[in-house]
Amino acid sequence: MSKNISTTPPVSCTLCPRRCGADRSAGQTGFCGAGGTLKAARAALHFWEEPCISGTRGSGTVFFSGCTLKCCFCQNYPISAEGLGKEITVEHLAEIFLGLQEQGAHNINLVTPGQWRPWIIAALDIARAEGLRLPIVCNTGGYETVESVEAWRGSIDIWLADLKYVSSSLSAELSSAPDYFAQARPAIEAMMAQAGHPVFDSEGILQKGVILRHLALPGHIDDSFAVLDQMAAWNEADPGCFIPSVMSQYTPFYKAAEHGIGRRITTYEYRRVVNYAMDLGLTAGYMQQKSSAREEYTPSFDLTGI
C-alpha cells in the first residue's frame, strides 16, 4: 500500500537522531554523507547473515551509501565513510528489488537505509505494485529515533538491529555518538512492538520479527556484559520477543588502531561474553564462531547489481 511518501530531499534533515539540519535539497550532505540523490554501492545475494536470513538461497542485500554512525572500525567504511556508491533513481531501486527476487532471494535486506528512508519506501511501494512479495529486512546499527522506526511501519517486516554499546563514553569514542544507547534502547523497543515475536516459514526462514545483534569488541567486554544485561531484561519482560545474535567477527578495519582496538578479540574474551549471555538465558539465538573474524566475509563494493 502506497504511503504517498515524498522523495523531495529534506530542506532541514531530521531523518536520524543527529538532526543535523542539512539542506539536502540544495545539495548539502548531512553528517551521514548523504545528499539529495539516492546512492547505493552493491546489490547481490548475500550468504553471511544469520541462517534464518540467508537461508540456502541468500539474502537480497542492498548496501546504501552513507551512515548515521561514524564507527572507527567499520568494515564497510568505503561506503559508510568515504562516499563510494552510484546515484540511482527510485524507479531503478524498485527494479533492483524485483531483480533480487527473480534471483531467488529469501528477502530484501536494506543495509544502513535510514538516511534514505523516504526514497526507499517509495521504491518498495513501486516494487510491491509490480509483484515484490518478499519480507523486507531493515539492517541497522540501532542508532534510530522512535519516530524513524514508526515511519517504516508497513514497509519493514524484519529488524536486523545492532545494540553496540551501553557506555556513552565508549560510543562517543568509537562511533561519535555519545547518545547511542539513549537513542537505541527506545528505538529497539519500538521495533519489537512493531514487528512482534519472530515468525518463520516452513524452511526456517524468518518472515517477521527482530534479530538483535551485538558485536563483542576487544578490550571492552565489560560493556558487552552491560549490553547483554539489557537484552536479558527485555527477554525476561517478554520471553522470545527477539532473537539474540552475539558476534565474534570483529576485525580491525578503517581507523580502529587509532582508538585502541587494533586487534581481534581473543578466544578468552569472547568465551567470557558467550558464557555471560548463556548464564543470562540468551540461548534461543546465535553465537558466532570465533573463526568468523575473517576479512573475506566483507563484500566487495564494486557496484555489483547497481
Predicted regions and their residues:
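Short, conserved acidic/polar surface loops in the N-terminal third of protein domains
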Residues: C72-N76, E82-E87, I120-A123, S148-V149
